[in-house]
Amino acid sequence: MTQRPAPETGEQAPDFDLRDQHGQRVRLSSYRGRKVVVLMFYPYAFSRVCTGELRKVRDDHPELVSDSVQLLAVSCDPTFALREFADRQDLAFPLLSDFWPHGEVASAYGVFDPERGCANRSTFIIDTDGVVRWAVHNAMPDARDLAEQGRVLAELTGPLE
């Protein structure tokens, strides 16, 4: 598996088909023409920073989970671990497993860390045409700025009602 460079703003987002925590297939291109996608890669289910971020999304950022926006959170954890993680944290949005082939989607987005065997903490906002409109990459221990993501989404989708 070859690590590609991360897609730049204005480029087509690589399509993928992954299973969520319930074993359901989720294909990025199925949202084209319907929803803006917030694609959040995170290193590990159950880790302190990742758990805190996803709980913050659940509690404080409804703009990341709405009728016009679809949040897809991706890690290299197996689906069974993601199911337990979602259940324990009461996470209703899709947690996608990039477990096998291990890190294939993270590699397509240029965010796979082969030494740690996980995705780096990165976010891509993808418009309804499947084009990357914003991306940010954070260091492993640093939580992402969810408020900034909200501002970018407001520019793409309009203010929350």
Predicted regions and their residues:
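Chalcogenol-based redox active-site neighborhoods
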Residues: M1-E161
